[in-house]
From Swiss-Prot:
Organism: Polynucleobacter necessarius subsp. necessarius (strain STIR1)
Superkingdom: Bacteria
Keywords: Ribonucleoprotein, Ribosomal protein
Matches recorded under CDD domains: Ribosomal_L29_HIP
GO molecular function per UniProt: structural constituent of ribosome
InterPro entries with a match to the protein in the record: Ribosomal_uL29, Ribosomal_uL29_sf
Recorded family membership: Belongs to the universal ribosomal protein uL29 family.
One Gene Ontology biological process: translation
Protein name per UniProt: Large ribosomal subunit protein uL29
GO annotations of cellular component type: ribonucleoprotein complex; ribosome
Amino acid sequence: MKNIELASKDLNALNVELTELLKTGFKLRMQKGTQQLTNTSQLGKNKRDIARVKTFIAQKTAQK
């Protein structure tokens, strides 16, 4: 997910994106716990994407 894509989205779309990322993160953690996750770098990427989306949500909220 690129910063340009996130900057062009409105607040509602960012909240939907955040919800999807949180669900994906939960699934990845469950796969890791059951030893089914083969690519553990997905966890870090997901965490960074969540932080990125939360940052844009905070910026959009501060602008209003």
